[in-house]
Amino acid sequence: MSTFGENITIADLERDPYPIYATLREYEPVSWVPSVNCWLVTRAKDVEIVTTKTELFTAQAPDSPVDRSFGGPTLMTMDGKEHLELRRALDAKFRPRIVASYIDELVRPIALEWLDRLLTQESRTAELITEYFEPISVLSLGSILGIGNLTAERLQDWFHGLAMGATNFEGDPAKAAENDRVAADIEFELRPRMQRMQDSPDNSTISSLLNHGCPVGQGRTIDYVLPSIKVI
């Protein structure tokens, strides 16, 4: 007799995953799902155990589309010392107390600008996710990363292309091609910037990931850091 998890399809998850998660939480809180080649853990207490007992559970997922999409191991798929070192490199910008000190000044002007754009549209209608919330999100994060000069349209294109690749469990060639197009554009834009940051560090998050905790002139390589930048 097959389990509920064995009968879950990618199409089911893409259509509406939340009823599926609810069923798993009630009947199969730890379930092997062949369609995505991984275990789904859906109860909060179990999730806490999996994410904190690093001596028992690994974040590495070499057979998932995640590492392929982002171009290598990332913060999400690293364990131990590697993960800790990159996390520490992010602390200067992303500790809750630090975020609280700058988030309003950073986000409010962006939110107001994009609200004004919506209000000047003749139709007075909008798709709020793509035309308001996503631009605010990507532009705010882009500023923190050190790429605040890039347009919302380009950053949204990166976001959607990488997400498409990271969830391409079915190995769809069209999704892989779209991911690769976006990855190439990111490489084209970021690699020269990162080379400059290696020579002349600044206070951006990207620079911190390259240089934090490293001896002068011996920072992390671009190839090592870039996958985690894509995740962020």
Annotate each predicted stretch with a short phrase:
Residues 160-218:
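Cytochrome P450 catalytic core segment centered on helix I
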Residues 117, 196-197, 231-232:
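Hydrophobic side-chain positions on well-ordered alpha-helices
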Residues 1-129, 138-156, 160-181:
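Active-site substrate-recognition loop segments, prototypically the cytochrome P450 B′-helix/B-C loop
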Residues 134, 138-143, 180, 186-187, ...:
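Central I-helix of cytochrome P450 enzymes
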Residues 90, 159-162, 209, 228-232:
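Short alpha-helical scaffolding segments that buttress acidic/His motifs in well-ordered protein cores
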Residues 14, 83, 104, 183, ...:
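Generic alpha-helical segment signature
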